[in-house]
Amino acid sequence: MPPFEEIDNTADWAFRVSAPSSEALFTEAAEALYRMSGVLMEPASEKIRKIHLSADDRESLFIQWLNELVFLLDRDRLALHGIQIDQLTDTLLSISGHPAEVRSVGKYVKAATYSGIKITQTDGVWQATVVLDV
């Protein structure tokens, strides 16, 4: 099964991402966001950028994570490469990644939405369904 698949959505974009762990779910979702947006990046920097987020629950944390990536793309024209999860609980996320300048974006995402957000674990496979406002 591929790590993500686009889902038909009338007004926005939606995707379902699958991974063998909750940590991998967050990194695969970042990849899905970049690929669906058509992000082309320069080679990654040797620098490390750390991001720390907190939320009330795992679904909110997941949406905050994707919106942080959207913010970095929009404001700084940066994407993260080689993302590693340093800490992940139901309410806390700490990641490290190498920032890369974005050469081009095919289509900008305004935000990841809470519409239909769902994270599940079945038979050792984690899945999340996300709707993006474009």
Segments and roles (model prediction):
Residues M1-V134:
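Intrinsically disordered, low-complexity regions
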